[in-house]
């Protein structure tokens, strides 16, 4: 009976006894034989129990309890579960506890009847206090993985309290950490980027820009740093390789153009002006000179030995001023980087030419440098590697005049902009559509193969920019993006050359101050003074050049000082033309030109500083009229026999020399004429009536003329043309004098350039005129490959004893 009733009670209420007071896991294993009579029954029975009452059933129950206790200790770590599971079990205990209350009444009735049986089983509940303490002890023996979440929650709960209790101790520790983290985040999320620009004078300019800054932002900063107003000729380049550059687009973000690389750029001349004399400010011409010097030194602008020596002499004159033996010494030219293959002979020639310059300002030297450099074939040409349809390596050059094709460093074809109808590219091919000629009916398309698609697109962009800048009066509007539109929307976004010249004419500011690289002019002046410098005197001009008429500054700077006094000298000599027996030797003429005008020019410069602006303008206008009248009278006969023959035999010429034309050279056919004249001349002084006998000198004059056949559609005698510019370049040595006269005229809407070069050689020994002529023509063709020789005159005067 007792066993059946105990099993019945155990089956009816096992959950109620298992889930009370946090002892669910342990009690489920140790209280299975306990009858569900409630928690109070064992306590009451335990109090009534006497220590003397021991029966066999009691001993068996104690043994069973000791075995269960040992098992509970062994499996205590396995029976304990995480907190989340315990909480869920507690909820179940509450639900089961409600159901267990209904059964209490039934259990009480049964408890009275089974009092004896319960009394026998009461000692089983005696170790209950021990079982209550076991879970608390076992919690400390759980694995760290199970206790870590609970410990972390406790720490989080305790942190605010601990902070409130111990504010003074923990605040100084936590604040620096927060500040360091915040500062670290600021550096990481910095909106600015560092940009570095290498300028033409090899200095580095650095600036900070916003993260989304565009190309025009940094370009404006660079131009402001350089104090350049005529900024449209310049640009910033990104060098992808030592030989490949890409121009920075002013309308795009800088970050998108550098593609994550460093923001490092170089300042370069993007559009080379075809006529540098039209630039308004000296500082613009100076930076153009720096770019050309870099082009020559890097080999991008090849030139002959003679041209290189001439350009080098102007470079030295611009940087160090007039030559002074005490100051410069002997090897001062070697300090300049003039050529990639600089030799001792070149340095000696440059020094020899530099010593012949006197009273030439740096601005005049820069202008003479540009006037000679612009005649070179590769001046301002942007070279791109390509291949023709047959796979032959060629080079495509883009310049202000159009597209040019080079093969083995020789120009084999040229496509001027007026003849180009369309330029396009497809994949890695580049196409030029040519306008049909007078005898052609259809348009022709010429294709070239470039190394990659990117190279073809780059060439196309360069062509678009050059054509827009030099040929159009205003830029085209950028087309809007349309759905499924074909073609590129790229357009040149800056100002054109016409707009730049118009803006330059409106410049009204004092001449900007700038320091020349490597200049040694700060320690001395032209007259030997210790304080005043030519640079300082140049900066005292009240206004800049654009205040004067547009064409006047070019003539003023191009014409050296001696030209001012040539007109009065010529006027005095004209009445003597009727005296054939009296003439002046070329050597005397050279001496007259050297000695007379220099002091007058320097005096004018000193007086100009004390005059008002109106007086300066009137003074320069009068000089301009003198120069214009003199240059227009260049074809007129000269007083000497030698000058008269030169001028009268060359009414139409593009390039003429005092020498013979080399046989076999390209150009129009030349007709040879020879004149031999024997005349008597006296050595008496001009203007004096001979009052005594003067020894006669017999002179043999021999003139050989090579003249090209004239074109039928050009008649220079009937249409003299409008004079644009004219200037003279003179270089002297101990035995020869070279004078180059360059004149530009416009006839019938066509610009014509006339270059006349005269070489006067004096000496007692025999001279090989043929060799001199060959050398002169060779140098001329290297300097002016686009021009042809129309006339050559060899004039020889020999005194017969």
UniProtKB/Swiss-Prot annotation:
Chain residue ranges for the region called Spectrin--actin-binding: 588-651
Listed Polar residues bias regions: 141-151, 591-601
Tissue: Found exclusively in photoreceptors following the terminal mitosis of retinal neurons. When retinal synaptogenesis is complete, protein 4.1 is also expressed in the inner retina. In adult amphibian retinas, protein 4.1 is detected in photoreceptors, bipolar cells, and ganglion cell axons.
FERM domain: residues covered: 193-474
Record-annotated membrane-spanning stretches: none
Comp. bias (Basic and acidic residues): 88-107, 167-182, 563-577, 604-613
Start and end residues of each stretch annotated as Hydrophilic: 477-587
GO biological process: actomyosin structure organization; cell division; cortical actin cytoskeleton organization; positive regulation of protein localization to cell cortex
InterPro entries: Band_4.1_C, Band_41_domain, EPB4.1_FERM_F1, Ez/rad/moesin-like, FA, FERM/acyl-CoA-bd_prot_sf, FERM_2, FERM_central
One Pfam family matching this protein: FERM_C
Subcellular location: Nucleus; Cytoplasm, Cytoskeleton; Cytoplasm, Cell cortex
Maturation and modification: Phosphorylated at multiple sites by different protein kinases and each phosphorylation event selectively modulates the protein's functions.
Annotated coiled-coil segments of the chain: none
Region annotated Disordered, chain positions: 1-187, 516-613
Annotated Acidic residues bias: 108-117, 154-166
Main localization of the protein described in the UniProt heading: nucleus
Entry keyword set: Actin-binding, Calmodulin-binding, Cell cycle, Cell division, Cytoplasm, Cytoskeleton, Mitosis, Nucleus, Phosphoprotein, Transport
Signal peptide: none
Function summary: Protein 4.1 is a major structural element of the erythrocyte membrane skeleton. It plays a key role in regulating membrane physical properties of mechanical stability and deformability by stabilizing spectrin-actin interaction. May be required for dynein-dynactin complex and NUMA1 recruitment at the mitotic cell cortex during anaphase.
Subunit structure as annotated in this protein's UniProt entry: Binds with a high affinity to glycophorin and with lower affinity to band III protein. Associates with the nuclear mitotic apparatus. Binds calmodulin.
Name of the protein in its database record: Protein 4.1
Organism: Xenopus laevis
Gene coding for it: epb41
């Amino acid at each position: 009976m007792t066993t059946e009733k105990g099993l019945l009670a155990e089956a009816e209420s096992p959950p109620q006894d298992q889930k009370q007071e946090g002892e669910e896991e342990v009690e489920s294993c140790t209280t299975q034989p306990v009858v569900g009579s409630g928690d109070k029954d064992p306590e009451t029975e335990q109090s009534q129990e006497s220590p003397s009452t021991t029966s066999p059933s009691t001993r068996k129950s104690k043994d069973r309890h000791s075995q269960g206790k040992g098992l509970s200790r062994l499996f205590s770590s396995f029976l304990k579960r995480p907190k989340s599971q315990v909480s869920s079990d507690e909820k179940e205990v509450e639900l089961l506890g409600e159901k267990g209350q209904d059964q209490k009444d039934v259990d009480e009735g049964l408890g009275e009847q089974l009092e004896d049986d319960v009394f026998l089983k009461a000692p089983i509940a005696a170790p209950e206090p021990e079982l209550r303490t076991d879970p608390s002890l076992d919690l400390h023996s759980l694995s760290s993985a199970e206790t870590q979440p609970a410990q972390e929650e406790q720490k989080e709960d305790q942190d605010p309290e601990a902070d409130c209790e111990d504010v003074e101790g923990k605040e100084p520790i936590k604040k620096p950490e927060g500040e360091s983290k915040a500062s670290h985040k600021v550096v990481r999320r910095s909106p600015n980027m560092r940009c570095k620009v290498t300028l033409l004078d090899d200095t580095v300019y650095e600036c900070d820009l916003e993260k989304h800054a565009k190309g025009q932002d940094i370009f404006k900063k660079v131009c402001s740093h350089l104090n350049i107003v005529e900024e449209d000729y310049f640009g910033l380049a990104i060098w992808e390789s030592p030989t490949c550059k890409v121009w920075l687009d002013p309308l795009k973000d800088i970050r998108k153009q550098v593609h994550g690389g460093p923001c490092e750029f170089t300042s370069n001349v993007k559009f080379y002006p075809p006529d540098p004399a039209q630039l308004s400010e000296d500082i613009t011409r100076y930076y153009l000179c720096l770019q050309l010097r870099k082009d020559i030194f890097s080999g991008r602008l090849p030139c002959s030995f003679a041209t290189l020596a001439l350009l080098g002499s102007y470079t030295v004159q611009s940087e160090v001023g007039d030559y002074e033996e005490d100051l410069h010494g002997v090897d001062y030219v070697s300090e300049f980087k003039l050529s990639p293959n600089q030799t001792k002979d070149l340095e000696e020639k440059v020094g020899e030419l530099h010593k012949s310059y006197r009273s030439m300002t740096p601005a005049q030297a820069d202008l003479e440098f540009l006037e000679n450099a612009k005649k070179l074939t590769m001046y301002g040409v942007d070279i791109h590697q390509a291949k023709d349809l047959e796979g032959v390596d060629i080079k495509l050059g883009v310049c202000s005049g159009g597209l040019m094709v080079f093969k083995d460093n020789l120009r084999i074809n040229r496509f001027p902009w007026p003849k180009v109808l369309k330029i396009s590219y497809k994949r890695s091919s580049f196409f030029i559509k040519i306008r049909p000629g007078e005898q052609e009916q259809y348009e022709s398309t010429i294709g070239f193969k470039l190394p990659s698609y990117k190279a073809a697109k780059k060439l196309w962009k360069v062509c678009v920019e050059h054509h827009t800048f030099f040929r159009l009066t205003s830029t085209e509007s950028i087309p809007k993006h349309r759905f499924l539109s074909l073609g590129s929307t790229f357009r040149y976004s800056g100002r054109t050359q016409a707009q730049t010249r118009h803006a330059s004419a409106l410049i009204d500011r004092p001449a900007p101050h700038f320091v020349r690289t490597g200049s040694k002019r700060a320690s001395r002046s032209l007259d030997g003074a210790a304080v005043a410098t030519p640079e300082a005197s140049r900066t005292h001009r009240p206004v800049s050049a654009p205040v004067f008429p547009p064409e006047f500054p070019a003539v003023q700077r191009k014409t050296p000082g001696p030209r001012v006094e040539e007109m009065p000298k010529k006027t005095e000599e004209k009445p003597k033309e009727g005296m054939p027996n009296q003439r002046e030797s070329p050597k005397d003429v050279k001496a007259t030109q050297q000695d007379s005008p220099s002091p007058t020019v320097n005096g004018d410069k000193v007086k100009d500083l004390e005059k008002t602006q109106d007086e300066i303008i009137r003074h320069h206008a009068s000089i301009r009229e003198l120069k214009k009248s003199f240059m227009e009278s260049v074809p007129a006969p000269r007083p000497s026999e030698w000058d008269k023959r030169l001028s009268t035999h060359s009414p139409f010429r593009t390039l003429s020399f005092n020498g013979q034309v080399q046989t076999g050279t390209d150009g129009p056919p030349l007709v040879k004429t020879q004149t031999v004249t024997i005349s008597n001349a006296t050595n008496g002084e001009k203007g004096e009536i001979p009052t005594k006998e003067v020894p006669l000198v017999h002179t043999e004059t021999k003139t050989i003329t090579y003249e090209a056949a004239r074109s039928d559609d050009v008649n220079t005698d009937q249409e003299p043309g409008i004079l644009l510019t004219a200037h003279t370049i003179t270089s002297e040595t101990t035995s020869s004098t070279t004078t180059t006269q360059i004149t530009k005229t416009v006839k019938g809407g066509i610009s014509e350039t006339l270059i006349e070069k005269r070489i006067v050689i004096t000496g007692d020994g025999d001279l090989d005129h043929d060799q001199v002529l060959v050398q002169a023509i060779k140098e001329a063709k290297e300097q002016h490959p686009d021009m042809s020789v129309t006339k050559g005159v060899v004039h020889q005067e020999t005194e017969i004893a």
